């Protein structure tokens, strides 16, 4: 009998997100610089005869009654690819807001793949895991390794980055859930006119240099998300007004936003100020980068 295996499902933050156009296959051509927070969900896998999933934690209620879940889909696909007959009792501690632009479901699915390969003692290899991840969703592959990276294409092209300056993030969500599909519909991206080139490298330099580059790159999903949920603008403004904030922006398709800070003390003070002014908000502080 193998003991339980627990994996962290860390929040994915899109520091930049460019939508270059809609591809012929229906997917959008993207370029995004992503980092991973220290906070996130937790997934535990235990031996069992059948596959089953229990969800607990602050945001568990948002997943109750789902007929299918990315975690279970990941487990079934891994079992099919490896031919394993074992089951597993999966417990997901849901600490991240649902439908919030920080890759929670994708990170959970990736954590399930990591946990179950260990629990079942299988080694499907990178090619198989990448194929499963791509079938589950555009963000699952980058969440498998949960490392700072530039990702592009529909999420299948990933270049790890190890030399970003270290910084601190305050993550803030005012209790808004946004459908990724709805945000893309509102964006109404034009068809991709030509095969895009690879993204330009992140220029080396100081944290101030990085913040200036991030500001210029932007998040193309922020305007359509603001149209659907104007309250996101209030979250961004509140972050931007905190002392030491170098950049305030929405992550992914929203509605979670982040503030970027040079020092831990600045980030923690900002979170305290925001919590006092907005006691209902979800707030997390995390290091990222270097």
From Swiss-Prot:
ATP binds at residues 97-107. It comes from the Bacteria. InterPro entries: GHMP_kinase_C_dom, GHMP_kinase_C_sf, GHMP_kinase_N_dom, IspE, Ribosomal_Su5_D2-typ_SF, Ribsml_uS5_D2-typ_fold_subgr. GO terms for biological process: isopentenyl diphosphate biosynthetic process, methylerythritol 4-phosphate pathway; terpenoid biosynthetic process. Keywords: ATP-binding, Isoprene biosynthesis, Kinase, Nucleotide-binding, Transferase. The active site is at residues 12, 139. Its EC number is 2.7.1.148. It catalyses: 4-CDP-2-C-methyl-D-erythritol + ATP = 4-CDP-2-C-methyl-D-erythritol 2-phosphate + ADP + H(+). Pathway: Isoprenoid biosynthesis; isopentenyl diphosphate biosynthesis via DXP pathway; isopentenyl diphosphate from 1-deoxy-D-xylulose 5-phosphate: step 3/6. One of its GO terms (molecular function) is ATP binding. It is an enzyme of class 2 (transferase). Belongs to the GHMP kinase family. IspE subfamily. Catalyzes the phosphorylation of the position 2 hydroxy group of 4-diphosphocytidyl-2C-methyl-D-erythritol. This is 4-diphosphocytidyl-2-C-methyl-D-erythritol kinase. It comes from Parvibaculum lavamentivorans (strain DS-1 / DSM 13023 / NCIMB 13966).
């Amino acid at each position: 009998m193998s003991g339980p295996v627990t994996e962290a499902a860390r929040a994915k933050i899109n520091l930049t997100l460019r939508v270059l156009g809609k591809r012929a296959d229906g997917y959008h051509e993207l370029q995004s610089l992503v980092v991973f927070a220290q906070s996130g969900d937790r997934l535990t896998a235990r031996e069992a005869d059948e596959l089953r999933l229990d969800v607990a934690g602050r945001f568990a209620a948002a997943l109750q009654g789902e007929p299918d879940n990315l975690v279970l889909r990941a487990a079934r696909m891994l079992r099919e690819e490896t031919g394993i007959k074992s089951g597993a009792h999966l417990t997901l501690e849901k600490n991240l807001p649902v439908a919030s632009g920080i890759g929670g479901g994708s990170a959970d699915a990736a954590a399930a793949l990591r946990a179950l390969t260990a629990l079942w003692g299988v080694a499907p290899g990178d090619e198989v895991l990448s194929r499963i991840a791509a079938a589950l969703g555009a963000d699952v592959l980058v969440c498998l390794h949960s490392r700072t990276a530039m990702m592009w294409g529909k999420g299948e092209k990933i270049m790890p980055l190890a030399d970003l300056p270290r910084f601190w993030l305050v993550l803030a969500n005012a209790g808004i859930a946004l459908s990724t599909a709805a945000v893309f519909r509102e964006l109404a991206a034009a068809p991709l006119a030509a095969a895009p080139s690879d993204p330009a490298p992140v220029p080396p330099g100081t944290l101030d240099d990085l913040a200036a580059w991030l500001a210029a790159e932007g998040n193309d999903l922020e305007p359509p998300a603001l149209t659907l949920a104007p309250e996101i603008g209030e979250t961004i403004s509140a972050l931007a007004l905190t002392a030491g904030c170098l950049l305030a922006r929405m992550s992914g398709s929203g509605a979670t936003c982040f503030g970027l800070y040079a020092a831990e003390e600045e980030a923690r003070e900002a979170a305290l100020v925001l919590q006092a002014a907005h006691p209902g908000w979800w707030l997390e502080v995390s290091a990222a980068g270097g």
